[in-house]
């Protein structure tokens, strides 16, 4: 199987513009464990290794969701309470205006976790005039992105896509990926605990789970570690420490990533292990939105802060692959568990606009692992 996994890694590294790639695959019982990397970690030519930390982008949403649910366990946050209960009044003013009706106070914490709020994505949605905010940021260079600026963009330049959804409905529930939801969840966390995100994630998750080489920008890892790999925009390096600190997304290593997902899946990340199952109680499928092609869409499903991905049977009729559960990020990174195969995997390529890469790599990894687990054919 290692040759097949190496082939997947080689293909990741060979993609246009990709300067390095990291890949890890591990069985649930750890009888099989494969970590590898290829390419240069930065423009000095430093080799990328499996131990090199890399930017995990929106995989961080798993960590944010875990912290929110830990606050729910302690009674500090309630999933079905309006999110405005936990943030300052100015943030909540007219944030969800649709057809002349302000539905901001109808949005619960659960809506934010499930991407069921209908709120516009402040980064990727296109305003009536001018470019998307993410494109403006990339052209302007490094700077802070405050919560007030995020709220102003959503309120003044964009409009909601649909009303907050009934998450108890029997039929289809509309969901649409929006980074705005998780910026608001970060605001809830920091307000409730009166502490910055880089300190919160350290005390709530990194220390209890011994994730020694994971940290949020503005913070430090628990243990001395290698310098992180560089983010790239094609063949050019992309350095934006202030912007990344504003986003709150983490740096981590492949080993820490798999350790975190194991803890999240088993419930060890929580005071009550049963809390983990809340993230996976209901799955709602994203639609396809041609106006924002870089956002996750069909056939991806979403729970509470967690993704489920599988390709339809008709897409791969002769070699279907089972679902994986976890998250991806826009920089071509992923962290997934496959319950059917009992397989954990993570990886990344650190390209600023490579969100589709994981969905091409995952089926290949699943097929390689499944073929490895199959018993040899009988000679009888």
Regions found by a protein language model. Give the residues of each.
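Short, conserved catalytic-motif segment at the N-terminal edge
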Residues: 2-56, 76-77, 92-93, 218, ...
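Hydrophobic (often cysteine-bearing) scaffold residues that line and stabilize catalytic clefts
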Residues: 5, 56, 60, 64, ...
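Residue-level preference for non-acidic, small/hydrophobic
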Residues: 9, 23, 29, 61-64, ...
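Short active-site loop at a secondary-structure junction
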Residues: 16-20, 44-112, 165-179, 245-248, ...
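Short, well-ordered beta-strand elements
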Residues: 32-35, 335-351
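Short, surface-exposed loop or secondary-structure junction motifs
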Residues: 95-323
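Short, surface-exposed beta-strand/loop micro-motifs that present aromatic residues
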Residues: 249, 323-326, 331-344
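Short, gly/Ser/Thr-rich active-site loops of penicillin-recognizing serine hydrolases
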Residues: 282-292, 354-380
